[in-house]
Amino acid sequence: MNTVRVTFLLVFVLAVSLGQADEDGNRMEMRQEIEKTEADSSYFAENLLLQKLEELEAKLWEETSEESRNSRQKRCAAEGIPCDPNPVKDLPCCSGLACLKPTLHGIWYKHHYCYTQ
């Protein structure tokens, strides 16, 4: 009878100690799952933020490209290139240049050229 009690007590103590170990293991597993879930949610939040920033950047680049496309200078004649004082037929001089008659006489006296102002 004593051996039965001792055996029962031994089995009871082992069951309680192993049960607590499993409970501690479950707690650790839960902590790991929570940390993993938090890491995943922060990863998804970062991806969402990245997508929003990329969309915003794309919109900004579109606006700047439209502005530069509309404001760019059309074809023009560079310095020292023959031009027409009334730029209907020929290209106008580029910005910062004026279509002037050369000061020296020579074979080109009938033409105007683009010079700096």
UniProtKB/Swiss-Prot annotation:
Keyword Secreted set for record: yes
Entry similarity comment: Belongs to the neurotoxin 14 (magi-1) family. 01 (HNTX-16) subfamily.
A Pfam family matched in the record: Toxin_22
Entry annotated with the keyword Signal: yes
Domain notes from UniProt: The presence of a 'disulfide through disulfide knot' structurally defines this protein as a knottin.
Originating species: Cyriopagopus hainanus
Intracellular or extracellular location(s): Secreted
Keywords of this entry: Disulfide bond, Ion channel impairing toxin, Knottin, Secreted, Signal, Toxin
Gene Ontology MF, one: sodium channel inhibitor activity
InterPro entries xref list: Toxin_22
Propeptide: 22-75
Protein name stated in the entry: U9-theraphotoxin-Hhn1a
Signal peptide from the UniProt entry: 1-21
